[in-house]
Amino acid sequence: MAKEELIEMDGVVTDVLPDSRFKVQLDNGHEVMAYSAGKMKKHRIRIMVGDRVDMEMTPYDLTKARITYRHKVGGPPGPVTGGGNRPPPRQPRRR
């Protein structure tokens, strides 16, 4: 199947199921079964109920989809990067 044949849709995750599967409500009101793409699993991108996602669907089976992107939504900030409780660098001695 060529990539040009895929249908791209947006939706909201309504239910989290076992084995990286999700129920997603499309913008047009239909509900489909979706799974997260391999790159999302590889980079450990977590998908929660209420997340807005982009999906790819094949025209042959419109009840299944692959989640390709999770939209960033406002929420608590992520972990602070940069060293944590590291002391400041030492200054060289003056002679």
UniProtKB/Swiss-Prot annotation:
Q: Which Gene3D superfamilies match?
A: Nucleic acid-binding proteins (2.40.50.140)
Respond yes or no to whether keyword Protein transport is given for this record.
no
Give the UniProt keywords, A-Z: Cytoplasm, Initiation factor, Protein biosynthesis, RNA-binding, rRNA-binding
Which intervals carry biased composition (Pro residues)? 86-95
Q: What is this protein called?
A: Translation initiation factor IF-1
Asked whether the keyword rRNA-binding is assigned, the reply is yes
Q: Which GO terms describe its cellular component?
A: cytosol
Residues spanning the signal sequence = none
Localization terms from the record: Cytoplasm
The record's InterPro entries line, in alphabetical order, gives: NA-bd_OB-fold (IPR012340), RNA-binding_domain_S1_IF1 (IPR006196), TIF_IF1 (IPR004368)
A single Gene Ontology MF term assigned here is: rRNA binding
Tell me the segments the record calls region Disordered.
70-95
Q: Where is the S1-like domain?
A: 1-72
Which family is it part of? Belongs to the IF-1 family.
Q: Which gene encodes it?
A: infA
Main function: One of the essential components for the initiation of protein synthesis. Stabilizes the binding of IF-2 and IF-3 on the 30S subunit to which N-formylmethionyl-tRNA(fMet) subsequently binds. Helps modulate mRNA selection, yielding the 30S pre-initiation complex (PIC). Upon addition of the 50S ribosomal subunit IF-1, IF-2 and IF-3 are released leaving the mature 70S translation initiation complex.
Q: Name one Pfam family in it.
A: eIF-1a
Please name the source species: Rhodospirillum rubrum (strain ATCC 11170 / ATH 1.1.1 / DSM 467 / LMG 4362 / NCIMB 8255 / S1)
Q: How does it assemble?
A: Component of the 30S ribosomal translation pre-initiation complex which assembles on the 30S ribosome in the order IF-2 and IF-3, IF-1 and N-formylmethionyl-tRNA(fMet); mRNA recruitment can occur at any time during PIC assembly.
